[in-house]
């Protein structure tokens, strides 16, 4: 192999690294093309109240308030949804209905740049969005910290861990959680120095040790987006009290394919909150 060929390979590799760095946002965030929030199917009988939440930096976040029925437990779930699409897509309303059936009220918000929310997604921005939604629960809805359970799925698990490390709450539920975006990125692109060039970190593995409230980890065995090993490692790094539940299904359908275990685990967790 001549030096000229070696030089071309090096230049091509560096070009690929630069290209990935410049397009990092597109590789990390998948807001989708649907900007409007789609009303939930009538058969779910979800009493959705559309609200707008204002962030500290002045952005408006499209959000849903879904109150529990007469059998309310008094607890509220603050939903940090997964990465793809907005809060009304990909079967999420059915998920909300299942949670509401447990006597839980919900506040689901869209991250900046997702759905009807203004702005563009960034790591610090998503943390601000969760903090603004928590403030809305406290100040606008009058919910006490001891009645707030923070819920995060997939990328939302990192947002939820960050929030739980900074504010008082009753509990934390993580589904399909990752240790960090950088680690998952390195697994997906093993020949690229993702840990060195990545700006979006979401280092849950570094923050979970500060979360001392009760924690429930849910992870599907066949999850091919965030492998089970991520959830296990995060669980091992977390202080007690904590519970880990393995589920049948994939990254976003365990609540349907293993509904008894899924919702039964959440019910048991909430009922055990001191």
Identify the role of each PLM range.
Residues 244-250:
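Short glycine-rich catalytic loops that host catalytic nucleophiles or stabilize transition states
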Residues 250-263:
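Catalytic histidine-centered segment of alpha/beta-hydrolase-like enzymes
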Residues 9-54:
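An N-terminal hydrophobic leader/cap segment in hydrolases
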Residues 54-136:
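Membrane-embedded segments
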Residues 204, 213, 227-236:
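Short alpha-helix in the alpha/beta-hydrolase fold that links the catalytic acid
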Residues 221-226, 252-253:
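Acidic catalytic loop of the alpha/beta-hydrolase fold
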Residues 210-212, 217-223:
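Short beta-strand/loop motif that positions the catalytic acidic residue
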Residues 136-141, 146-191:
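Primarily recognizes the serine-hydrolase "nucleophile elbow" in alpha/beta-hydrolase
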């Amino acid at each position: 192999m001549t030096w000229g060929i070696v030089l071309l390979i090096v230049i091509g590799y560096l070009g690929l690294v630069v290209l990935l760095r410049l397009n990092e946002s597109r590789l990390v965030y998948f807001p989708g093309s649907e900007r409007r929030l789609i009303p939930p199917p009538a058969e779910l009988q979800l009493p959705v109240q559309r609200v707008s939440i204002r962030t500290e930096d002045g952005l408006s976040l499209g959000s849903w308030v879904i109150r529990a029925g007469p059998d309310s437990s008094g607890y509220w779930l603050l939903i940090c949804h997964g990465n793809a699409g907005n809060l009304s897509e990909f079967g999420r309303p059915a998920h909300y209905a299942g949670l509401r059936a447990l006597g839980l009220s919900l506040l689901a918000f869209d991250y900046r740049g997702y759905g009807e929310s203004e702005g563009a997604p960034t790591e610090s921005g998503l943390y601000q969005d969760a903090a603004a939604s928590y403030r809305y629960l406290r100040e606008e809805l009058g919910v006490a910290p001891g009645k707030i359970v923070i819920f995060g799925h997939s990328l939302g698990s990192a947002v939820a861990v960050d929030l739980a490390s900074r504010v008082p709450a009753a509990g934390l539920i993580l589904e399909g959680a990752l240790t960090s975006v950088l680690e998952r990125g390195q697994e997906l692109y093993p020949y690229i120095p993702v840990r060195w060039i990545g700006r979006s970190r979401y280092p849950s593995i570094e923050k979970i040790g500060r979360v001392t409230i009760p924690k429930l980890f849910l992870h599907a065995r066949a999850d091919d987006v965030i492998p089970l090993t991520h959830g296990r490692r995060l669980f091992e790094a977390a202080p007690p009290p904590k519970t880990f539940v393995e589920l049948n299904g994939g990254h976003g359908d365990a609540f349907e394919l293993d509904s008894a275990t899924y919702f039964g685990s959440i019910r048991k967790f909430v009922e055990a909150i001191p």
